Regions:
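C-terminal accessory helical subdomains adjacent to catalytic cores in phosphodiester-
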Residues: 1-135
């Protein structure tokens, strides 16, 4: 069975993980495509590290718009994954994506990512609901 819709595919995998682990407090999360989708929720954050990349940031924003303005959908192949698109426009990102990407994504907090990345937001909301129930 091949699941075409990326959201349904990830949901299927997360449900399988949940059932396999079998622990009610385990909340699986598989990032839709890759971490850099969260950076594409607000590409302008990349300007904090790449201060002269204004034109490249505008191109990244256009890419997201072309995917229904949904950063989680930006991926149609090995060369078009979010990180590959960032690297194509900002080659310096390749050498420091692990350190820069995680720091930049965390600077704004998660509200921007939650607002633009449905799958990510659903997972965070599950965690927050459990946390609120525990209080």
């Amino acid at each position: 069975m091949k699941i075409i819709d990326p959201y349904k595919r990830v949901e299927f995998l997360e449900n399988a993980l949940f059932e396999d682990i079998g622990y009610h407090k385990f909340i699986p999360y598989i990032q839709l495509h890759e971490f850099e989708a969260l950076l594409l929720a607000n590409p302008e954050i990349l300007l904090m590290e790449y201060v002269t990349a204004h034109n490249q940031i505008e191109k990244l924003k256009e890419i997201v718009v072309n995917y229904d303005n949904n950063p989680e959908k930006v991926n149609t192949g090995n060369t078009t994954a979010p990180s590959k698109r960032i690297i194509a426009l900002i080659p310096e990102y390749e050498g420091n994506k692990v350190s820069v990407g995680s720091v930049l994504a965390g600077i704004e907090g998660i509200e921007v990512q939650k607002g633009r990345c449905k799958h990510f937001a659903d997972w965070i909301n599950k965690i927050q609901n459990i946390s609120e129930q525990s209080v």
